[in-house]
From Swiss-Prot:
Predominant place of localization: cytoplasm
BP GO annotations: enterobactin biosynthetic process
Keywords from the UniProt entry: Cytoplasm, Hydrolase
Subunit structure: Homotetramer. Dimer of dimers. Interacts specifically with the aryl carrier protein (ArCP) domain of EntB.
One GO term describing the cellular component: cytosol
Source species of the chain: Escherichia coli O17:K52:H18 (strain UMN026 / ExPEC)
Name listed for the protein in its UniProt record: Proofreading thioesterase EntH
Catalytic residue list: E63 (nucleophile or proton acceptor)
Role summary: Required for optimal enterobactin synthesis. Acts as a proofreading enzyme that prevents EntB misacylation by hydrolyzing the thioester bound existing between EntB and wrongly charged molecules.
Length: 137
């Protein structure tokens, strides 16, 4: 297991109370040895005007996952902040849920890189994101 902080899914989800994460309906669903996953509904909260999943919602899911994964790689007195987010959208989603899967690409002392892949309910890749974070403290 790579994580330096050991949080349960319930503890992870509690961090979302009264935030944009909760407003978008993002829920952490799996914490593995080197992976963090979450689901987000595709509904009126996450649609763009044409009834499809908004690219910004996919980006919010990615940044949520990468930032929390980054935080779990810090020690007491440290935190992470996002420095760069890149998203490539592959296919539209109009309903249901999407699942984000976050894994590390680079874990340095001062910076981290995370890959977050967003899948639809059929397991098709909808969006590929890369998040860079800086470790502070």
């Amino acid at each position: 297991m790579i994580w330096k902080r050991h949080l349960t899914l319930d503890e992870l989800n509690a961090t979302s109370d009264n935030t944009m994460v909760a407003h978008l309906g993002i829920v952490y669903t799996r914490l593995g040895d080197d992976v963090l996953e979450a689901e987000m509904p595709v509904d009126n909260r996450t649609h763009q005007p044409f009834g499809l999943l908004h690219g910004g919602a996919s980006a919010a899911l990615a940044e949520t996952l990468g930032s929390m994964a980054g935080f779990m790689m810090t020690r007491d007195g440290q935190c992470v902040v996002g420095t760069e987010l890149n998203a490539t959208h592959h296919r539209p989603v109009s309903e249901g849920k999407v699942r984000g899967v976050c894994q590390p690409l680079h874990l340095g002392r001062q910076n981290q890189s995370w890959e977050i892949v967003v899948f639809d309910e059929q397991g098709r890749r909808c969006c590929t994101c890369r998040l860079g974070t800086a470790v502070l403290g």
